């Protein structure tokens, strides 16, 4: 089976010259097979450790040398682009956030139809299979998502006499009262992934959307969008501080853990880190993790919908080890391995497989009880349109957050902001038309 | 230009009558094979690792290339599309404001700092070393500390201002578009100032003392000496430093990427960050390359003109 | 003997005005240092005084760095790459600067300008085509990739700086040496270089700083954890999605700045005098 790949050959040749100085790696030994995997630093570090353990275990069983490389998620884009450009790099790669990579790198990803059909039945089937197929094919496996519940300070809610707020309007009311006593509501509205998630959730909850099912028609210009925008304007001016315009993905976590925010729309990572760092409520000895609870993502007049980062995994088709890589994916997607992996991640990394959403970890802590519920209403960010490179670009350019923020801050009227977003989106979608 | 310098030297040598004949000296500067052999390594390095990728980038900007594909020729279509995009026009404006403001700040403050450093006697090394530090700490990490200092919730800057009762509310350094631009300019200045100060200091050291003494005996005060001796003699250094810094400031990526990601409302996007979003995140290399190269023709012209001027100035010293 | 008035005056006209500059330069670095020494519970408590450490100094962040990550390997990698790239660039720079400063040959002027123009090429763009080249050379995932690519942005600067420096050295001594039978290379090494030491040190220091700080190429061309450079390693491992390990990041920045700070402490005077001659001419 062992083949000397061109890459290995070149490396050996180059290594000969380099060998004396032993800079970098020793010349690769051509006889051993090596499988490499590029992944992102997980938000819960134990997840990476468990993945590494499984990867090595599989490697030992199959006599394959394995290497798991971890990078910060912000750097993944650069790395993917460089590997595709060079047609060389890792065998397996994390993809995302979002399924857009499958469209963007369609020609460079190996088909995973066989793996996807193999692993589904053992795990109770995919949550929403049609969402993950890109141009009718499995180009990646959706891997994990961090569902976005509402993280809330129960002690403050009690003080305000509020009981289980459920709609976005409820949260506006709570936030308004909270802000009056120095505990505003917090949701990012700047250039960050969280801003995309929450503002899209609000847009859908009010019945709006930005692209039609056909993946072509821009549907942002609607009365539902206007309603959503007016709501966000009120939320911004009455219930939040202007700082949300500059928030990155980490800011709302800090706002909650510092004891300032009454509630944030965020995965459980804030709670997890508060628990680990033993952060206390300012001015008391009480641990803040004890007064945090997570409840359902809010409902709007039209719907209850949310989205999140869809993290995926794929295999480059220029890899010399496509079959080996598939074999590892099958191994990792075995129920017992996925179970251990979800356990290690405290449920933060929820797979897109039905059985895993019922993982015992979600019953282990009262905090997690709504996570599976949120997952049920979670849709891809381009909903109801398909995931495409264009929808990914709408996400990457933060068109949705900017549209909302420009209206909320009074920089533009609702109509101006919508017209602006509509034009940008039309340009993006038009520029993305595939040549016949 | 080279020629003139050489002739000048030959004339000098001949006049002093201590050098070999002009013919031999002329022979000594004509050694083409050696010249090429010496330049060879640099030439091939730049050819393969800069020129080739650069030509490819030029091609990208004129094609509909995506990541991994060479694409086909589309002329100036990418540039035309950029000019239709509101975000790009905003980026263009931001880049000009950012570069102009940061350069002005760095030049003025750098000059003041260089003049001060020049006169130091005690703690000279210590203070020179201290002001040089921002330039040498890894940018990828030092930008993070700035972000931590301006981060809305924990901002030490706001904490200080509030504690001193200068303001009684949190200043929205990063949420407000104009303050955000101010902040990224400030951080760029922090990082670039040492380069200006130290290089200008080097220029000051090189100015002969006698010129100041002569100006003083002509009755020039400190300000007069500054304008009539220091500034004219520093001009060549200033020109090069500003040119260098203009190029690097215009290509700045890290500060904006860490502090604002181009927000709020794209009001701080620069060429590099916008090109990153278009070219890498969205995979439209053609578009991204067009953003990066948008100012290239103008810069090229500026470099040519300025280099010519600098050389002339250096020649007539 | 100077009068007290003369001794005090510089205090107001010189040392007082220079203070704001020093503060501006140092405060962020001071903040970096104390952040790296604070306990998390104090770091994330909004009610504390941000620039003091009240609840005790901790070395926990440094421990995290050296025990839970491969920090010291990254540190050594950075050192190897920076030193190697610096040596390569300075040597190539010296070789290229010499004929540009001393010889007349067809294409000399154009090459001088071309060297400067390379700076106009934005690195954020160049790295994609460059990654193809690096891969074809078989250098991906080895430190060689960086030793080979860093000179692309170091050589132009070194050449430019040394070119200026060489021009300030009188050429008579070289001419004498050549009449005595030395060849070009011998003249360059034995006669010119010893006089040009400040210029060479200045170029080397600059090259070392730029290599040490480089991020993009190091990220793109090298993946294995044990081969990462310091900045890439620290950022990869200590920024985890929406959680930043502030203490650890700042500890990395502090330790990571040390080698350059030490280099500058030793060579600061050379740096200034090297620039004096090199950049000015």
Regions found by a protein language model. Give the residues of each.
Chain B
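A structural signal for multi-pass alpha-helical bundles of membrane permease subunits
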Residues: 34-317
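Transmembrane alpha-helical segments of polytopic membrane transport and secretion proteins
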Residues: 1-39, 122-124, 307-317
């Amino acid at each position: 089976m062992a083949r000397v790949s061109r890459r290995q050959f070149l490396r050996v040749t180059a290594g000969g010259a380099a060998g004396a100085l032993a800079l970098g790696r020793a010349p690769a030994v051509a006889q051993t097979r090596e499988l490499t995997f590029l992944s992102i630093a997980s938000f819960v570090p134990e997840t990476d450790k468990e993945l590494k353990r499984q990867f090595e275990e599989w490697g030992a069983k199959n006599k394959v040398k394995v290497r798991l490389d971890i990078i910060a998620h912000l750097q993944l884009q650069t790395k993917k682009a460089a590997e595709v450009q060079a047609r060389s790099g890792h065998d397996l790669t994390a993809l995302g956030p979002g399924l857009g990579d499958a469209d963007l790198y369609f020609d460079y990803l190996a088909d995973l139809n066989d793996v996807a059909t193999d692993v589904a039945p053992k795990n109770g089937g995919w949550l929403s299979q049609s969402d993950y197929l890109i141009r009718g094919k499995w180009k990646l496996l959706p891997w994990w998502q961090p569902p976005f519940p509402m993280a809330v300070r129960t002690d403050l809610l009690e003080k305000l006499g509020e009981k289980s707020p459920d709609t976005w309007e409820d949260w506006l009311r709570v936030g308004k009262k909270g802000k009056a006593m120095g505990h505003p509501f917090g949701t990012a509205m700047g250039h960050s992934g969280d801003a995309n998630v929450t503002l899209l959730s609000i847009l859908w909850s009010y019945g709006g959307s930005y692209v039609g099912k056909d993946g072509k028609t821009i549907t942002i210009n609607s009365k539902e969008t206007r309603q959503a925008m007016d709501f966000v304007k009120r939320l911004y001016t009455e219930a939040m501080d202007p700082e949300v315009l500059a928030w990155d993905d980490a800011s709302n976590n800090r706002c909650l853990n510092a004891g300032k925010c009454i509630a944030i729309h965020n995965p459980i990572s804030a709670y997890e880190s508060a628990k680990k760092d033993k952060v206390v409520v300012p001015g008391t000895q009480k641990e803040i993790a004890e007064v945090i609870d997570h409840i359902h993502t809010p409902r709007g007049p039209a719907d209850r919908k949310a989205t999140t980062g869809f993290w995926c995994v794929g295999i480059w088709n220029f890899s010399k080890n496509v079959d080996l890589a598939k074999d590892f994916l099958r191994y990792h997607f075995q129920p017992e391995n996925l179970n251990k992996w979800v356990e290690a991640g405290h449920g933060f990394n929820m797979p897109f497989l039905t059985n895993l959403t019922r993982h015992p970890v979600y019953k282990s802590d009262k905090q997690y009880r709504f996570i599976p519920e949120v997952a049920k209403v979670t849709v891809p960010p381009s909903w109801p349109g398909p995931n495409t490179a264009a929808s990914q670009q709408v996400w990457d350019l933060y068109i949705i957050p900017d549209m909302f923020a420009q209206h909320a801050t009074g920089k533009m009227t609702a109509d101006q902001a919508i017209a602006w977003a509509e034009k940008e989106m039309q340009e993006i979608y038009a520029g993305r038309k595939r040549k016949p | 230009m080279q020629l003139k310098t050489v002739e000048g030297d030959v004339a000098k040598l001949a006049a002093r009558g201590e050098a070999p004949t002009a013919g031999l000296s002329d022979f000594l500067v004509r050694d083409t094979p050696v010249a090429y052999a010496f330049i060879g390594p640099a030439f091939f390095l730049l050819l393969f690792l800069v020129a080739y990728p650069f030509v490819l980038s030029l091609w990208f900007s004129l094609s509909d290339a995506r990541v991994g594909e060479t694409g086909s020729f589309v002329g100036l279509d990418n540039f035309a599309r950029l000019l239709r995009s509101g975000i790009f026009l905003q980026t263009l404006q931001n880049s000009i404001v950012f570069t102009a403001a940061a350069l002005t700040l760095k030049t003025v403050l750098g000059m003041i700092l260089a003049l001060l450093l020049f006169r130091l006697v005690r703690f000279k090394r210590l203070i020179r070393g201290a002001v040089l530090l921002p330039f040498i700490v890894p940018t990828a990490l030092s930008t993070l500390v700035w972000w931590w200092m301006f981060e809305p919730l924990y901002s030490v800057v706001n904490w200080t201002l509030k504690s001193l009762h200068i303001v009684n509310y949190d200043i929205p350094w990063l949420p407000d578009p104009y303050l955000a631009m101010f902040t990224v300019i400030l951080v760029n200045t922090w990082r670039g100032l040492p380069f200006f100060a130290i290089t200008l200091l080097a220029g000051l050291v090189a100015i002969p003392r006698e010129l100041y003494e002569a100006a003083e005996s002509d009755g020039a005060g400190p300000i007069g000496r500054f304008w009539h001796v220091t500034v004219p003699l520093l001009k060549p250094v200033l020109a090069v430093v500003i040119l260098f810094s203009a190029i690097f400031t215009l290509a700045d990526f890290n500060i904006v990427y860490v502090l604002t990601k181009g927000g709020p409302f794209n009001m701080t996007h620069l060429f590099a960050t916008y090109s990153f979003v278009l070219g890498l995140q969205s995979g439209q290399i053609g578009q991204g390359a067009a953003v990066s190269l948008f100012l290239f023709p103008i810069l090229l012209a500026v470099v040519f003109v300025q280099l010519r001027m600098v050389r002339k100035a250096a020649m007539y010293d | 003997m100077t009068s007290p008035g003369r001794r005090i005056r510089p205090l107001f006209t010189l040392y007082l005005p220079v203070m704001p500059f020093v503060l501006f330069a140092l405060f962020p670095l001071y903040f970096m240092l104390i952040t790296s020494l604070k306990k998390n519970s104090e770091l994330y408590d909004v009610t504390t005084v941000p620039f003091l450490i009240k609840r005790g100094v901790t070395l926990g962040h440094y421990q995290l760095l050296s025990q839970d990550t491969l920090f010291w390997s990254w540190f050594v990698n950075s050192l190897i790459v920076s030193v190697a790239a610096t040596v390569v660039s300075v040597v190539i720079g010296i070789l290229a600067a010499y004929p540009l400063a001393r010889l007349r040959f067809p294409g000399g002027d154009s090459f001088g300008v071309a060297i400067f123009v390379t700076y106009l090429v934005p690195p954020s763009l160049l790295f994609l085509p460059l990654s193809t080249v690096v891969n074809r050379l078989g250098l991906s995932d080895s430190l060689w990739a960086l030793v080979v690519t860093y000179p692309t942005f170091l050589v132009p600067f070194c050449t430019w700086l040394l070119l200026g420096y060489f021009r300030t050295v009188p050429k008579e001594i070289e001419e004498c040496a050549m009449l005595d039978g030395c060849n070009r290379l011998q003249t360059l090494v034995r006669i010119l270089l010893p006089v040009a030491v400040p210029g060479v040190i200045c170029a080397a220091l600059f090259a070392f700083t730029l290599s040490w700080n480089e991020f993009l190429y190091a990220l793109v061309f090298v993946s294995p954890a044990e081969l990462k450079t310091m900045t890439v390693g620290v950022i990869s491992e200590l920024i985890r999605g929406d959680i930043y390990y502030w203490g650890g990041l700042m500890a990395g920045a502090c330790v990571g700045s040390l080698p350059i700070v030490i280099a500058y402490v030793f060579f600061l005077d050379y740096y200034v005098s090297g620039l004096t001659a090199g950049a000015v001419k």
